[in-house]
């Protein structure tokens, strides 16, 4: 919750448009949203520097979609990792603007365009490391960094 949103809530309380319990509920909701199967941490970016990441193994396609939709509702960037092709297809049907990288096993949604900063080089030793390197690249990209990749840089015995 940003300063303007807090100020608006206080104004509504002062003008008696909302009672103290309603204001407390909204403040509480701004921090975590309980979806029944997951608690979405909306203030993680303020505490840790980046939004919550959806780790997909063990979640259904609908659960991944519902978490992503909740995050989008709060104008958060969305990064889902280790997502299967089937689950990604389901989420893409619901959220066509999502970006899926099958090699990285990621699905991402940017809340807004941003200017990229810095440069991070991701180097993998062998071709079997490419999925992990691609996941790192997608993570760096959504965090607003320019990336460069060098694959299969290792030297086999």
Predicted segments with their positions:
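Short secondary-structure capping/turn micro-motifs that flank functional sites
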Residues: 87-88, 107, 156-157
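A broadly conserved detector of short glycine/acidic/proline-rich loop/turn motifs that flank catalytic sites
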Residues: 59, 113, 126
